[in-house]
Amino acid sequence: MSSSSYNPYKNNVNDRLINNSTDSFQDNDQGIPNNNDTFLSRIFGLNSIYNQLQDNYQYYDPEFDSSLNQQLQQSIQENDEAEDESLLPQHQQQQQQAAPMDLSIQDKSAKQKSKSSSLLNSDSDSDLSSSEDSYVRPNIPQIPSTPIETENQGSSSKIKFSIPQRAKNFVGKLHPHHEPTLPVYQTPQEFRRNLPQQQRASATVNTNYQRTRNNNRRFIIPPKERALYLWANITNMDEFLSDVYYYYRGRGLLNIVLSRGFDLIILIFILIFTVFLKWGIDYSIFFDNLHQEESKHITLNDMIIPNYFATIPLSIKFILFGFSVYILLRSVQLYLDYNYKLKELKNFYHYLLDVTDDELMTISWKTIVEKLMLLKDYNSLTSTTKSNNFSENHYVNDLSSKVRLNAHDIANRIMRRENYMIALINKDILDLSVLFMNEKSLLTKTLEWNLKLCIDNFIYNQQGQINGKILKEYNRNQLARELTSRFKLAAIINLILSPFIVIYFVLLYFFRYFNEYKSNPASILGLRQYTPYAEWKLREYNELSHLFNKRLIMSMGPANTYIDQFPKGFLVVNLMRLINFISGSILAVLVIMGILLEDENHSFWSFEITDGRSALFYISIFGTIWAITASSATGTSHESTISTTSQSSNSNSNSNAASTFVYDPEASLRYVAQFTHYLPSSWNKKLHTIQVKNEFCQLYCLKIIIIINEILSSVLTPFILWFKISHNSGNIIDFYREYSIHVDGLGYVCYFAMFNFEEKDKNMMSDLNKSKKRRKRMKNKMNKYGKTKMVNPISGKTVNSEIEMTKISKSESERSSDDESGNEQDYDNDEELDYLSYKKDDKMIKSYMYFLESYGGSKQPQPQPPQQQQHPQNQNQTVGGLRNRNPIQSIDPAIMTGNYYDQQSLNSSIYNINYKFDDSGLLQDETMNSSSRKKGGVLGMLNQFYKQDINR
């Protein structure tokens, strides 16, 4: 396909002028109002990412696009030159000077016709490895033509038209007798052949491949050609990559459609079933029949009220109408997504990535990224092939350079908004505390949804980039007022909808967890889950959702083991044992009597122990109480665990059975931290305390409490939005302005997501520089005093000054950081101390290391259980590897936790990693060549971060 290929649904964006300057793009973006996205439309999902069916790649019409067989293509291609020359009169030789500008442009493009081959014109089974100029270019804005003067002027050259191949094929198919075809471009009438009257009339109508009734045959593009066209004409790379990842997470077309369809069916069932139970059954018939002496046999049909929908209150009908509109919109959205997006994504996966839906169940995302990078030369935005056509303007949506496409950039595009949200929570920008409740319990899914609704639509534009007005400091106060008004509007809407939302959540959770509660009551009360606040706190930058969920699931087992090691309180444990014994005794008596007193004439199960309450009712009540208290009574304290262990150790049955459980909460928490990557310095030397356990339980909370908080949040969300979050509008604007950096080929992204360690002014290198100056100052003092004898003024003893200087250095470092005190005792030189200080409790470096592990590192060995402890000398061998380290080859557990001295008896930590990573394939981008690698990019960052170690 040539650069002027026809698009059945033209992009309006192609008609705009493309600014190569980023600043001018931002200024122009400020003046474009976003009237299509409103607050209510976001509530009902009208403008979600899977409902904004833009014109860039979603719409395809098989009536307009066709694929011809190879014989027809060859026959038409042989007559291409003859058709072009037949359009020109032979007697006019001097028309080139007065020719329109578009003809001269097409004359240049016709000379390069032999070098450019379209992916759409290739066979359906053709390979992707074509020539470097074979990718499809976006449409170039057409320059309007002007009439050509009719005067005869002498000229030695001919004017030649370059007709798009698809136009020739299509028109040639309509006219099988090889009649002269019409050029797509506007040309004077005198350059055209004298056509018959019937063909001339049809030519004036069919100008843009409009549907014709003369041809009864239906033309359909092969799926592979459609996939190639989809990829070659992508303009919004952020949205497309998000769709690709959404399809990967959904595990295929069928699974996505069925899951979304069944979710709607569940919602419909909840509404219909609830209304039927409340207004559709006359319960008085049942209770009146129970109190009558001669009870009649009644069925459910006798109790159903005919035409009960008319008796429903008007307010309930209004609520049902709102839910009906919501369900209708979601159904239409599902249909549009299936018809125009999901099917195209399926073709893209199957034909270009060579991944079927069945394979999506087991394939890794790393493999998908590798396959995506192989397609970069087939899209003009991502292609690194140099073009000699200087008149060609690539369609660039948010940048003035090539769109980068590697593992790091793909993750940044998919998680552009999530990275900002992670930084917002970790930097404590939002104040969510209300009265006695802290932010860890108040941040629920409902509040999180409202925050995204208010912030995302305000901060980001339609292309997914940061709004240019946010980056201007003089707009700060005005933007803060606008964001405050959005929070207050959301608070009003939530206040109106809160009663209905509460009812919906109560019914949803009741129907969802009742069966699980019935089968295992203790599982509901004892089951734990990470809170929404913990999910944002523990998530790393550029960590996709499936990788994050994998980490959380792997940490749940060790987390439960860690919590169970703490005593639950003597009063609670003994009270549970008492209740369990009493309820179990009553339950046993009732069950035995029911078995013994059962005969044909009498049934003990229907015997009323109290008025209106049978024995079966009390059996179910006491059985539930016994099941709940049984799980709590078994969780005894530390002393009972030790006594049980000692008793089992005295037995000769199995001497090793006593050592299966070791009470060591400190080692257990470090083992949990290997999965959560969360072990703050405030927990240092306190890992065995109840205080740390309570703080961890705020992140890993009981599921029943999370459900209660979710229901209460529906009532508290309006007040939090109005009185708390609205006062943080200025801080939110400042955060997005200060922590947004522009990357060529990527746009504006969160600072922490770029892993740029060269910046020294954003809490990355300040502590390291301070520690360097402090140690240099102390080293000068030591050199000044030497190893002379001096008297300690406190003890009065003569000591070595070198030892005293070491103590002074240690005490001074303790005032700045507790973590450095332990490290200074175990390392000999300042370089290793600098390295450890740099690693101190830094989320960005943790995210970077985990990113390397996920996308390119060698297979990491599974974390060892905390019972397998090493001696201090073994750890010294591990630390010694740092002295001869290569980039990311050996990371000691003490590096990430910050206190090595406190960890000499333990080998578990946040990271017990042996990285052997070569990122030359995945993290390398061909667009960042020459000198740009020295200052930016992942490889440049690695060189900058480890250049001192390599030179050493």
Curated annotation (Swiss-Prot):
Keywords: Autophagy, Cytoplasmic vesicle, Endoplasmic reticulum, Golgi apparatus, Lipid transport, Membrane, Phosphoprotein, Transmembrane, Transmembrane helix, Transport. It catalyses: a 1,2-diacyl-sn-glycero-3-phosphocholine(in) = a 1,2-diacyl-sn-glycero-3-phosphocholine(out); a 1,2-diacyl-sn-glycero-3-phospho-L-serine(in) = a 1,2-diacyl-sn-glycero-3-phospho-L-serine(out); a 1,2-diacyl-sn-glycero-3-phosphoethanolamine(in) = a 1,2-diacyl-sn-glycero-3-phosphoethanolamine(out); a 1,2-diacyl-sn-glycero-3-phospho-(1D-myo-inositol-3-phosphate)(in) = a 1,2-diacyl-sn-glycero-3-phospho-(1D-myo-inositol-3-phosphate)(out). Phosphorylated by ATG1. ATG1 phosphorylation is required for preautophagosome elongation. Its main location: membrane. The chain crosses the membrane at residues 261-281, 309-329, 578-598, 615-635. GO terms for biological process: autophagy; cytoplasm to vacuole targeting by the Cvt pathway; lipid transport; mitophagy; piecemeal microautophagy of the nucleus; protein localization to phagophore assembly site; reticulophagy. Residues 115-133, 867-877 have a biased composition (Low complexity). Residues 1-33, 69-159, 806-832, 855-889 are annotated as: Disordered. One of its GO terms (cellular component) is phagophore assembly site membrane. It comes from the Eukaryota. Residues 806-818 have a biased composition (Basic and acidic residues). Signal peptide: none annotated. It is found in: Preautophagosomal structure membrane; Cytoplasmic vesicle membrane; Golgi apparatus membrane; Endoplasmic reticulum membrane. It is a multi-pass membrane protein. Residues 282-308, 599-614 are lumenal. Residues 491-511, 703-723 dip into the membrane without crossing it. Residues 1-260, 330-490, 512-577, 636-702, 724-952 are cytoplasmic. Residues 819-832 have a biased composition (Acidic residues). Residues 142-159 have a biased composition (Polar residues). Homotrimer; forms a homotrimer with a central pore that forms a path between the two membrane leaflets. Belongs to the ATG9 family. Phospholipid scramblase involved in autophagy and cytoplasm to vacuole transport (Cvt) vesicle formation. Cycles between the preautophagosomal structure/phagophore assembly site (PAS) and the cytoplasmic vesicle pool and supplies membrane for the growing autophagosome. Lipid scramblase activity plays a key role in preautophagosomal structure/phagophore assembly by distributing the phospholipids that arrive through atg2 from the cytoplasmic to the luminal leaflet of the bilayer, thereby driving autophagosomal membrane expansion. Required for mitophagy. Forms a homotrimer with a solvated central pore, which is connected laterally to the cytosol through the cavity within each protomer. Acts as a lipid scramblase that uses its central pore to function: the central pore opens laterally to accommodate lipid headgroups, thereby enabling lipid flipping and redistribution of lipids added to the outer leaflet of ATG9-containing vesicles, thereby enabling growth into autophagosomes. This is Autophagy-related protein 9.
